[in-house]
C-alpha cells in the first residue's frame, strides 16, 4: 500500500471540536473500509488540557450519535506536525492564525493548512463554534 493520508484536526484545547472531528472521521473511514489508508489525529493550540480526555459533554453528545471519543487524549500542537501531516484542518479563524505562526517555525513544512469547514460546499470560510467557551 502507498503512503497513508495524514489528517490533523485542530482547535483551542483539543477537548471538544477537534477530538469530535477526529472521532467522527475515524468512524467514517473505518465504516468505508479505508482505515489502512489514513493516519488521523487531533491537537490543540493551547496546552490547557494535555493528556486529558475530551470534555464529558462532547463525549456524551458523540456517544449519542454513535461515536466513541473515550480513548482520545488532548495534546499540544508541534511545529513538526506540519511535516508529519498532509492536512491540518483548523476549526476557527483565531486558531488558524495561531497555526500560521506555528507553521513558520517548521522548516520544510508540507501540510496544507485550511479551515475545517472549507470542505463543506455551503460553509467555506466559516468557523465551527466553540461549545466550551461559547
Show which residues each predicted segment covers.
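Conserved active-site segments centered on acidic
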Residues: 2-84
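Short alpha-helix boundary/capping motifs
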Residues: 53, 90-91
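Phosphate-binding/catalytic loops
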Residues: 87, 93-134
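Helix N-cap/beta->alpha junction signal
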Residues: 18, 92-93
Amino acid at each position: 500500500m502507498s503512503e497513508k493520508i495524514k489528517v490533523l484536526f485542530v482547535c483551542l484545547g483539543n477537548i471538544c471540536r477537534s477530538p469530535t472531528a477526529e472521532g467522527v472521521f475515524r468512524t467514517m473511514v473505518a465504516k468505508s473500509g479505508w482505515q489502512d489508508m489514513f493516519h488521523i489525529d487531533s491537537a490543540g493550540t493551547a496546552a490547557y488540557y494535555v493528556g486529558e480526555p475530551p470534555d464529558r459533554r462532547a463525549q456524551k453528545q458523540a456517544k449519542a450519535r454513535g461515536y466513541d471519543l473515550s480513548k482520545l487524549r488532548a495534546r499540544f500542537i508541534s511545529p513538526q506536525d506540519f511535516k508529519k501531516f498532509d492536512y491540518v484542518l483548523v476549526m476557527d479563524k483565531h486558531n488558524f492564525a495561531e497555526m500560521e505562526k506555528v507553521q513558520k517555525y517548521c522548516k520544510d513544512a508540507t501540510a496544507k493548512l485550511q479551515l475545517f469547514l472549507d470542505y463543506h460546499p455551503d460553509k467555506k470560510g466559516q468557523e465551527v463554534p466553540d461549545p466550551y467557551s461559547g
